[in-house]
Amino acid sequence: RVLAAKECTNIYAPLANRLGIGQLKWELEDYCFRYLHPTEYKRIAKLLHERRLDREHYIEEFVGHLRAEMKAEGVKAEVYGRPKHIYSIWRKMQKKNLAFDELFDVRAVRIVAESLQDCYAALGIVHTHYRHLPDEFDDYVANPKPNGYQSIHTVVLGPGGKTVEIQIRTKQMHEDAELGVAAHWKYKEGAAAGGARSGHEDRIAWLRKLIAWQEE
């Protein structure tokens, strides 16, 4: 399993990243981390579990306030909390030499807007109601990542001075971020697929079989 995890780290996770398939990339990274660093994996998983209820209650209130403000301003967007992946938490702890409690993005929210205009309107609402940390702001909509990833990232100080990481993107950007190149296969094959299983789903299933094969 350790050998398989190393192969996933060196081959499949980078491949998923290059293809822009965020969902698969996160699954692979957590799988690899679980076997390559079992002690750290269990420690972070335990911390996340211990504080889950407090974190969920905090995010629920935070999201409720944002939804109300956006509705009042006529901004069309979905707002919800999003799970954090154990490997990404550990990597940020290592990179920035931070303790678990110091991380910005253990509390995380995503805003999926109807249009690009709604994206920036949502950003304006967020920054109007909460003080943001300028060093943690990135506009990958105006400046996409090399793999095509687009989102606005910002970190704000929520109630009680607790940091909250927020991603803002359109529905199209969200699908691209989750499925990568497979999203484009979906667009091309959607009309022909009808009610049947689409080609992009087959391709995603094939990529996931790589993980299952490595686990055997």
Predicted regions and their residues:
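Nucleic-acid processing machinery
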Residues: 1-216
